Swiss-Prot record:
Purpose: Choline-specific glycerophosphodiesterase that hydrolyzes glycerophosphocholine (GPC) and lysophosphatidylcholine (LPC) and contributes to supplying choline to the cells. Has a preference for LPC with short (12:0 and 14:0) or polyunsaturated (18:2 and 20:4) fatty acids. In vitro, hydrolyzes only choline-containing lysophospholipids, such as sphingosylphosphorylcholine (SPC), platelet-activating factor (PAF) and lysoPAF, but not other lysophospholipids.
Record protein name field: Glycerophosphocholine cholinephosphodiesterase ENPP6
Gene: enpp6
InterPro entries tied to this protein: Alkaline_phosphatase_core_sf (IPR017850), Phosphodiest/P_Trfase (IPR002591)
Residues holding Zn(2+) 2: 191, 195, 352
Species per Swiss-Prot/TrEMBL record: Danio rerio
Length: 438
């Protein structure tokens, strides 16, 4: 009888350990605009340093083209290029319905037409019966393919540090209690400060240090809650940032064309979408082609390497500025920063959206947890690769995507190594129990 009970107990312990591995949770952070070199000074960033020492850091993360936010939000969570998932810009226009997508702020931006081009990870998880909590994540408030996450703290402009730390605490509690299988937190301040003051400004350095303090708190909370062996933490950004000399490097379209011949213009900056009147198309194309510091593409001429031209909402003419240059209709229509006490100054000193291979557009990727190697430096990866990493940590089969497993496999602990470590810990637990230590 005693031997039978021992066998049953042994089986129970081993099953418990297997269940523990199966119940590993995932916490992801989308840090908007966090350039690849923002954490180069790890000596003075102890929060980031601990994650790097305990986990994986890639050399850099190449965004999808255009190196803008919404296209890359979706590439990160679908593993697909923009022309595949159809989220091709922060500002889009549908010629059939005349609807506009305006960086997610207007009611029409929640229409399924913009989002249903591909299935993001959180939708797949919900379909599989898993639970997802999301905090300020753009798109979590949208019904995509008929599905919404279990919980969504809707996006607000530039969430505060308190919003961030509160979200961390709430997310960890939801994951530990199994209310959530994955939690995602979006943080915008790095992007906002980079735009306003530039990527090398004192303001961006302060924002980075503030974020580092939040990650120090996160690391401490994970230890206090005894979650180091049960949670994978992944941090990534959507793009980088480059210095912008406001008003000095401006391409004014009305110097080359009559804007009344344009049916629709969407966005300004590094990438501008134009829909000229049909009878003026060739004239406008030829005139814009004479402009310096800018490439003009008919839709079918857009370089294949951009993985962009087959997008449903791509315009008939796409303008792409050289790095550091800014395309607009006219200087006079640009806003200025003015606090009422000083001379009006440049509205923005940093920008992104340029050719995705431009070095300043590179983003960041860090990860730590039981499924990742420790103190490991990996080579460059691409935005579309991140999805496969997330699926791997969740034990899910990824949907067809454009990512490369070969670029990210090196950062993962092998299944055998993970299983071996788990088995050793479980056997040790069993030994302690049998000897009466616990």
């Amino acid at each position: 009888m005693t031997r039978t009970l021992l066998k049953i107990y042994t089986l129970f312990i081993l099953l418990l350990c297997r269940q523990r591995d199966a119940n590993r949770k995932l916490l992801v952070f989308l840090i908007d605009g966090f350039r690849h070199d923002y954490m180069d000074d790890l000596h003075n960033l102890p929060g980031f340093r601990e994650i790097v020492e305990n986990g994986v850091k890639v050399d850099y993360l190449t965004p999808d083209f255009p190196s803008l936010s919404y296209p890359n939000y979706y590439s990160l969570m679908t593993g697909r290029h923009c022309e595949v998932h159809q989220m091709t810009g922060n500002y889009m226009w549908d010629t059939d319905t005349q609807k506009e997508f305006l960086i997610g702020t207007n009611p029409d931006s929640r229409l399924p037409m913009w989002w249903d081009g591909s299935e993001p990870l959180w939708v797949t998880m919900q379909k599989l019966g898993k639970k997802v909590y999301m905090y300020y994540w753009p798109g979590c408030e949208v019904t995509i393919l008929g599905v919404r996450p279990t919980f969504c703290e809707e996006y607000v402009y530039n969430p505060s540090e308190k919003n961030l730390t509160d979200s961390m605490e709430n997310a960890l509690n939801a994951l530990k209690s199994s209310k959530a299988d994955m939690a995602g937190i979006y943080y915008e301040k790095i992007d906002v400060e980079g735009h306003h003051f530039g990527p090398r400004s004192p303001e961006i350095q302060r924002a980075i240090r503030s974020l580092d303090q939040a990650f120090q708190i996160l690391n401490q909370k994970i230890r206090e809650k005894n979650m180091r062996d049960t949670i994978n933490v992944v941090l990534f950004s959507d793009h980088g940032m480059t210095q912008l000399k406001w008003m000095e490097k401006i391409i004014e379209l009305d110097n080359y064309i009559n804007m009344s011949h344009i049916i629709k213009m969407m966005d300004r900056g590094p990438v501008v979408s134009l829909w000229p009147k049909q009878d003026k198309f060739e004239e406008i194309y030829q005139n814009l082609s004479t402009a310096d510091n800018m490439n003009v593409y008919k839709k079918h001429e857009i370089p294949d390497r951009f993985h962009y031209k087959n997008g449903q909402f791509v315009s008939t003419l796409t303008l792409v500025a050289e790095p550091g240059w800014f395309i607009t209709e006219n200087k006079a229509k640009l806003p200025f920063w003015n606090n009422g006490t000083e001379a009006a100054g440049g509205w923005q000193h940093g920008w992104h959206g340029y050719d995705n291979e431009f070095v300043d557009m590179r983003g960041s990727f860090l990860a730590q947890g039981p499924d990742f190697k420790s103190n490991y430096r990996a080579g460059p990866i691409r935005t579309v690769d991140v999805y496969n990493v997330l699926c791997k940590t969740l034990g899910m089969n990824p949907l067809p995507n454009n990512g490369s497993w070969s670029r990210v496999e090196c950062m993962m602990r092998s299944s055998a190594a993970t299983a071996g470590a788990s088995l050793i810990s479980c056997c040790f637990l069993l030994l302690l129990t049998l000897t009466g230590v616990c």
